[in-house]
């Protein structure tokens, strides 16, 4: 079976395969153009007659559980990433698969991190055929150099849920690391020595997988309250000595930036939102965990405090600064998909106004609405943007695949999307004629904030009108690009072969772009 076949040009002008790892794929048609048909996928029917009447599903060890689950060649094995770089379970699963001589597995993580670098040896020896999920760091380099046997597929968090729900991906065995569980399999992420916050990224896995194994290091008597994963979905429970390192769930800097340029980006972004009337009593916002985004949140807090306003809700990932806004009464609710530090974990556990969400509620595009389009202001990053406001978040200027999509694509449906980004990194301009990899169509990106000026998407005539009298340096994106090239020169394009090594899916499951092998 070839990795891919039947290349076509999609609605974004990108050449993409329509056969991927032996399965038919649909090319991107435009925003909201592809409408799904049919019904949701479903797991196998089960019978209580096959489970212990006392509810005790505990199995002696992870190897025994995988064997009992029927692990075999060619299966799809899923894991979640709520422990981020502190995950101790994912690699163990494939250590066991290798020991058992299993080959051709598809790994379906909700994300990968540097702690998963050991997976490269299993990609090399055929234990893992390919990854459908983020391919960060060493895994991204391995993929970019054309070494992965199958074709990689990158999806957003919402796109992952959509793919499972729609039957595009069938999970054979889901391994769900849970900081606290009872013997029945009810589990949560807010209690126990490895508490990580929510477990929402594992929701689709629990709901749709043929076999679900919960792995915990904190087994409590029934019932485990609150439960984020319902034990009625769970086949087996395994107890290990340690499943995660909570200190390593920390994402980004989790500290406000001290860089003068980044502070300027934050200040201008907040000032833009204020002058454009985007901040009001009862508004909502979402920002990331990087230093610039955290600083923007602090500027928002100052504005709210001064005017005695409140944000109705903020979308997480949560962090100590967002938690402080909640506790101060500047934010009424945090709707949180993942916690970026231990203050977020504590708050989710103790504060009923800090509630966990999942990709189903927040991001699933094949549903009856989701939360993402209700957010007033969305602050995001990007590795590149182009003169048409298209953006890239997965590859760098050298063409290497180094990041996952996360919830980035899904949040583009917010009412105003702002990208505060440096005009250049390591003397390489960030604004290009065309992004290396298309991850977000420009029609959904409204404002680019750089340390040399702010560009408003011409589609947003309302924002252009509101900012006519602003003292902020409002410029065109072409002017910003020209200034970057005057300082740094015109950047060279990365050198690629014609071979496709991975694809980027859009939120509706269509193929948005191809990632090609880097010529070393």
Describe each region flagged by the PLM.
Residues 2-520:
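Conserved alpha/beta enzyme-core scaffold
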């Amino acid at each position: 079976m070839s990795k891919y076949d039947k290349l076509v040009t999609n609605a974004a002008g990108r050449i993409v395969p329509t056969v991927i790892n032996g399965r038919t794929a649909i090319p991107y048609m435009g925003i909201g153009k592809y409408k799904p048909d049919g019904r949701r996928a479903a797991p196998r029917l089960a019978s209580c007659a096959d489970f212990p009447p006392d509810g005790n599903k505990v199995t002696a060890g992870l190897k025994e559980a995988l064997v009992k689950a029927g692990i075999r060649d060619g299966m799809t094995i899923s894991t979640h990433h709520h422990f981020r770089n502190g995950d101790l379970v994912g690699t163990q699963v494939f250590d066991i698969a290798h020991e058992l001589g299993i080959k051709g597995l598809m790994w379906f993580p909700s994300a990968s991190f540097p702690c998963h670098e050991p997976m490269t040896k299993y990609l090399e020896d055929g234990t893992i055929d390919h990854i459908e999920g983020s391919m960060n760091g060493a895994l991204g380099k391995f993929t970019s150099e054309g070494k992965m046997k199958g074709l990689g597929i990158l999806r957003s968090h919402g796109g992952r849920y959509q793919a499972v729900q729609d039957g595009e991906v069938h999970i054979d065995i889901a391994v769900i690391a849970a900081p606290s569980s009872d013997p029945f399999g009810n589990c949560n992420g807010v209690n126990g020595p490895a508490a990580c916050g929510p477990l929402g990224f594992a929701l689709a896995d629990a709901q749709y997988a043929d076999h679900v194994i919960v792995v915990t290091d904190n087994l409590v008597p029934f019932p485990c309250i609150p439960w984020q994963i319902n034990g009625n979905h769970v086949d087996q429970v395994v107890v290990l000595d340690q499943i995660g390192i909570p200190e390593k769930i920390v994402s980004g800097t989790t500290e406000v930036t001290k860089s003068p340029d980044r502070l300027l980006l934050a200040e201008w972004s907040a000032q833009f939102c204020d002058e454009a009337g985007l901040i009001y009593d009862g508004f909502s916002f979402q920002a990331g965990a990087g230093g610039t985004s955290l600083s923007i949140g602090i500027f928002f807090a100052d504005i709210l405090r001064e005017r005695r306003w409140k944000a109705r809700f903020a979308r997480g990932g949560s962090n100590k600064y967002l938690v402080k806004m909640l506790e101060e009464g500047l934010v009424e609710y945090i709707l949180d998909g993942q916690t970026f530090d231990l203050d977020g974990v504590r708050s989710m556990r103790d504060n009923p106004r800090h509630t966990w969400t999942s990709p189903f509620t927040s991001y699933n595009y094949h549903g009856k609405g989701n939360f993402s389009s209700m957010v007033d202001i969305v602050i995001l990053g990007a590795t590149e943007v182009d003169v048409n406001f298209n953006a890239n978040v997965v590859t760098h200027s050298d063409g290497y695949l180094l990041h996952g999509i996360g919830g980035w694509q899904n949040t583009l449906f917010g009412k105003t999307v702002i990208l505060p980004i440096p005009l250049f990194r390591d003397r390489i301009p960030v604004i290009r004629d065309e992004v290396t990899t298309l991850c977000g169509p420009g029609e959904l990106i409204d404002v680019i904030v750089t340390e040399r000026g702010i560009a408003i998407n011409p589609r947003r005539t309302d924002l252009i009108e509101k900012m006519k009298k602003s003292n902020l340096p409002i410029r065109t994106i072409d002017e910003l690009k020209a200034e970057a090239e005057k300082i740094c020169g015109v950047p060279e394009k990365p050198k690629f072969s014609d071979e496709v090594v991975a694809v980027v899916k859009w939120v509706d499951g269509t193929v948005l772009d191809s990632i090609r092998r880097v010529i070393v």
